[in-house]
Swiss-Prot record:
This is Ribonuclease P protein component 1. GO terms for cellular component: cytoplasm; ribonuclease P complex. It is found in: Cytoplasm. Its EC number is 3.1.26.5. Disulfide bonds: none annotated. It comes from the Archaea. Belongs to the eukaryotic/archaeal RNase P protein component 1 family. It catalyses: Endonucleolytic cleavage of RNA, removing 5'-extranucleotides from tRNA precursor. Pfam families: RNase_P-MRP_p29 (PF01868). Part of ribonuclease P, a protein complex that generates mature tRNA molecules by cleaving their 5'-ends. Consists of a catalytic RNA component and at least 4-5 protein subunits. GO terms for molecular function: ribonuclease P activity; RNA binding. Keywords: Cytoplasm, Endonuclease, Hydrolase, Nuclease, tRNA processing.
Length: 87
């Protein structure tokens, strides 16, 4: 399940965002914090908040609000993530 993985090194694309200029941006995740993903686009690195965004990571769609936590905390929050996915 991709929601439990650490995203560093994975290919990411922004599918939906309140900021329309972010939609369609693609690259590799170079760093991940609790609230942001740092994406290396090839030309520069951009910081994208996870909140209110939808991503496609390695071909799978991911809701940014469900991954809005530290990577190591996602394993502890496994049951909450599964419950929210069922909604």
């Amino acid at each position: 399940m991709i929601y439990l993985d650490e995203f560093t090194g994975m290919e990411v694309s922004i599918v939906d965002s309140p900021n329309r200029s972010e939609i369609g941006r693609t690259g590799l995740v170079s760093f991940e914090t609790k609230n942001t993903l740092e994406i290396d686009t090839g030309r520069k690195r951009i910081m994208i908040p996870k909140h209110l965004r939808k991503f496609r990571i390695n071909g799978q769609f991911v809701d940014g609000d469900l991954i809005n936590m530290r990577p190591e905390d996602r394993l502890r929050e496994y049951r909450r993530i599964l419950r929210d996915l069922r909604r």
